[in-house]
């Protein structure tokens, strides 16, 4: 870019326009992106952001200017009005405050104690829970083992042999591999099947019979003779009527009577005050006059 010397310190309008055109052509011509509509970043663009910044070449210099002692003094609330020691002074990895040391370095109105390294013991010396009696009694736990030769060198078989005392016993896996059979636990007894509920009895229909007829009672003057005994009975019959299979001619049929709830018919009101001589018959109605 060429240098333009302005005489008198005045830049005209034509000179300013030429300077801007020259700036655009020489500086921004190659890196100028094409104009485009602004679009917000997508979720993938926000998720794939690269937050790993390159190493700062000034990080070491800044760390020397502001050592750990200054940062610790700021945390402790100590005002430092002067600069810390010159760069290059080594700082220990861990600093602790020891006010009992009389030697102090004046950094301003408020003195800051000297910081010396201290080894911190991070070992936990607290006693844990005491072991319970159950853990001692359990001993070795059962572990299912798979060996090349079933029953030889198997930890599962050794566990069962040690607990049972039988030297020839094998675990279920070795027994299955040797005999080709599975080991099943004892089968429990089958549950009793519920008894089927009895079906409700259906009402049986009675066989149809010939209609029963009532025999007309004999009058006081009639006489009936029994052919089997050759005896005759006189007077009204007190026995129930007999049932005959043959229907006689002109039988007496009962007539349905409607029961009424009206009071007894009286001639005058005084009849209601007197006690009735016979029970009130409500089966029939007296016809109206």
Curated annotation (Swiss-Prot):
**Protein origin, superkingdom:** Viruses
Result for mutant: residue 171 to S: Loss of transactivation
- Residue positions of motif PXDLS motif, CTBP-binding: 279-283
What keywords are annotated for this sequence in UniProt?
Answer: Activator, Early protein, Eukaryotic host gene expression shutoff by virus, Eukaryotic host transcription shutoff by virus, G1/S host cell cycle checkpoint dysregulation by virus, Host gene expression shutoff by virus, Host nucleus, Host-virus interaction, Inhibition of eukaryotic host transcription initiation by virus, Inhibition of host innate immune response by virus, Inhibition of host interferon signaling pathway by virus, Inhibition of host STAT1 by virus, Interferon antiviral system evasion, Metal-binding, Modulation of host cell cycle by virus, Modulation of host E3 ubiquitin ligases by virus, Modulation of host ubiquitin pathway by virus, Oncogene, Phosphoprotein, Transcription, Transcription regulation, Viral immunoevasion, Zinc, Zinc-finger
The molecule here is called Early E1A protein
Provide ranges: composition bias, Polar residues. 219-237
Q: What is the effect of changing residue 253 to E?
A: Reduces interaction with human ZBED1
Annotated consequence of substituting residue 267 to K = Reduces interaction with human ZBED1
Specify the residue ranges making up the unnamed zinc fingers.
154-174
Residue span of motif PXLXP motif, interaction with host ZMYND11 = 113-117
Q: Which organism was this protein described from?
A: Human adenovirus C serotype 5
Q: Which family does it belong to?
A: Belongs to the adenoviridae E1A protein family.
Cellular compartment(s)? Host nucleus
Pfam families registered for this protein in UniProt: Adeno_E1A
Where in this protein does the record say Phosphoserine is found?
89, 219, 231
Outline what the protein does: Plays a role in viral genome replication by driving entry of quiescent cells into the cell cycle. Stimulation of progression from G1 to S phase allows the virus to efficiently use the cellular DNA replicating machinery to achieve viral genome replication. E1A protein has both transforming and trans-activating activities. Induces the disassembly of the E2F1 transcription factor from RB1 by direct competition for the same binding site on RB1, with subsequent transcriptional activation of E2F1-regulated S-phase genes and of the E2 region of the adenoviral genome.
Impact of mutating residue 157 to S?
Loss of transactivation
Residue numbers of motif LXCXE motif, interaction with host RB1 and TMEM173/STING? 122-126
Region annotation Disordered: where it falls in the sequence: 82-107, 186-240
Which residue ranges are recorded for the region named Interaction with UBE2I?
76-140
Look up what happens after changing residue 154 to S: Loss of transactivation
């Amino acid at each position: 870019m060429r240098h333009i010397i302005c005489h008198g310190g005045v830049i005209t309008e034509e000179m300013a326009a030429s300077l801007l055109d020259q700036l655009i052509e020489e500086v921004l011509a190659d890196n100028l992106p094409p104009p485009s509509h602004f679009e917000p970043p997508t979720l993938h663009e926000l998720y794939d952001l690269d937050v790993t910044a390159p190493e700062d070449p000034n990080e070491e210099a800044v760390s020397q200017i502001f050592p750990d002692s200054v940062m610790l003094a700021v945390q402790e609330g100590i005002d430092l009005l002067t600069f810390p020691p010159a760069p290059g002074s080594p700082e220990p990895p861990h600093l602790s405050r020891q006010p009992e040391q009389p030697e102090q370095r004046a950094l301003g109105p408020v003195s800051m104690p000297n910081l010396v390294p201290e080894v911190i013991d991070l070992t936990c010396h607290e006693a844990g829970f005491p072991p319970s009696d159950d853990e001692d009694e359990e001993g070795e736990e059962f572990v299912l083992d798979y060996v090349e030769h079933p029953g030889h060198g198997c930890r599962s078989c050794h566990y069962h042999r040690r607990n049972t005392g039988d030297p020839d016993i094998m675990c279920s896996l070795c027994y299955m591999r040797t005999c080709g059979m599975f080991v099943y636990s004892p089968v429990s007894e089958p549950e009793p099947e519920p008894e089927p509920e009895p079906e409700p009895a259906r009402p049986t229909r009675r066989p149809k019979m010939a209609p029963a007829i009532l025999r007309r009672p004999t009058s006081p003057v009639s006489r009936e003779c029994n052919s089997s005994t050759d005896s005759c009975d006189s007077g009204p019959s007190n026995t129930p009527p007999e049932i005959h299979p043959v229907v006689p001619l002109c039988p007496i049929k009962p007539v349905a009577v409607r029961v009424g709830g009206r009071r007894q018919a009286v001639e005058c009101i005084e009849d209601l005050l007197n006690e009735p001589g016979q029970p009130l018959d409500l089966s029939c109605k007296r016809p109206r006059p």
